[in-house]
Amino acid sequence: MSQEDITGKDRLQELIGADYRLQWIIGHGGMSTVWLADDVVNDREVAIKVLRPEFSDNQEFLNRFRNEAQAAENIDSEHVVATYDYREVPDPAGHTFCFIVMEFVRGESLADLLEREGRLPEDLALDVMEQAAHGLSVIHRMDMVHRDIKPGNMLITANGIVKITDFGIAKAAAAVPLTRTGMVVGTAQYVSPEQAQGKEVTAASDIYSLGVVGYEMMAGRRPFTGDSSVSVAIAHINQAPPQMPTSISAQTRELIGIALRKDPGRRFPDGNEMALAVSAVRLGKRPPQPRTSAMMAQAEAPSPSESTAMLGRVARPATITQEAAPKRGSGIGIGLFIAALLAVIIGAVIYAGTTGILFNDTPEETTTPETITETYTPTVEETTSQWVPPTPPTRSTFTEPETTSHRPTTSEESTSEEPTTEAPTSSRTVPQIPTSTPRTSASVPVETNAPADDLIDAVNGLLDVGGAQ
């Protein structure tokens, strides 16, 4: 560590005070730097997220983030990373220095796990979804919304426990001007249609994002890809997701189809109903329909199962090492990226105005989609005793190779197939996963009729600030 780094750490330590002793930087996000630290009072390791000055100087952001951080201290769930403390301290320059103290989790993010494995067996993926849904149910009961559910914000511990992190940061981010240097673009791949259009975000928005995560875990690809964040957001608003592989059970495909409905009023309304639905599917049953009498009970915390133990063995808790500080010029690079994205938006608006391709949020008549069967050929015998991770497919941030295309469809339920018979009770065994997965993308034209200016509003709804995946 250079003398300059040591001096900077010492200055930061003075602001944080004697209750926490900084060790080293373990991560950087668009809004903050994360330090590993010792909680001297409680004798435990913690993660301290230090907000960047450009955000803590924004009063509207500060008010929102303060409210969310203080509310998060009251969240008590094994499946949500705990928030221990939040403080604001004036620095010598007269600015407000903000930091939040959180539970330090020795685990691997779901994003890293999927990057390595490609996809997960159905039973493991459903286990992840049920645990995450239960964590969301606690958040939603407090009338709060996470707003940024994605694999990068889901940690898996060595004993298979799933924990949601980065709670409450996206809401505060909406207060920051879009052109501020150092911003990063929100995660378009997991954004709900209403969030992409700048409409009201509710608990059902988190359910949509969790549905996208579930789709990706089992299909080995995201439902929507594109050349840019804008094109992905438009796909979330207008296109029906491609059908999931038929190797996935009908009841699980139906579950994901309900979660990915465009109309938030027709999805599971909150984490509690989602947890109940996933629990039913794990027992081999069809998911109950949202807002029915079967969904009135409170979901019980999922008990550790064989798949939970297997999940812990698959996850690889990261070795905690010191991370280099970002280069001073990194903010300029991000600023250029924002400028490029805005240029894409302007071009999209011009194109929309000349071709009639606009937004439409009204339900369209359902047509019968062409059924495309995806064949999976295992290279090893299926086993119920141990899962051997496959060779992961190549993953891409936005685009993926198209091997099969679906005809245009206006049905938002194309991922949901009605099973003709009741599925047998699950034995909760871990299936063997194929080592090679055909990957497909839907090619669906956008046909809409809302005002052209809505394109900018829709994209503005996307540009939330979030942590790095």
From Swiss-Prot:
It holds the Pfam family Pkinase. InterPro entries: Kinase-like_dom_sf, Prot_kinase_dom, Protein_kinase_ATP_BS, Ser/Thr_kinase_AS. ATP binds at I26, G27, H28, G29, G30, M31, S32, T33, V34, K49. The active site is at D148. It is an enzyme of class 2 (transferase). The keyword Phosphoprotein does not apply. Residues 286-307, 359-454 are annotated as: Disordered. It catalyses: L-seryl-[protein] + ATP = O-phospho-L-seryl-[protein] + ADP + H(+); L-threonyl-[protein] + ATP = O-phospho-L-threonyl-[protein] + ADP + H(+). SUPFAM superfamilies: Protein kinase-like (PK-like). Residues 20-281 form the Protein kinase domain. Residues 430-443 have a biased composition (Polar residues). Residues 365-384, 399-413 have a biased composition (Low complexity). GO terms for molecular function: ATP binding; protein serine kinase activity; protein serine/threonine kinase activity; transferase activity, transferring phosphorus-containing groups. Its EC number is 2.7.11.1. Keywords: ATP-binding, Kinase, Nucleotide-binding, Serine/threonine-protein kinase, Transferase. Belongs to the protein kinase superfamily. Ser/Thr protein kinase family. This is Serine/threonine-protein kinases PknA. The lineage of its organism: Bacteria, Bacillati, Actinomycetota, Actinomycetes, Mycobacteriales.
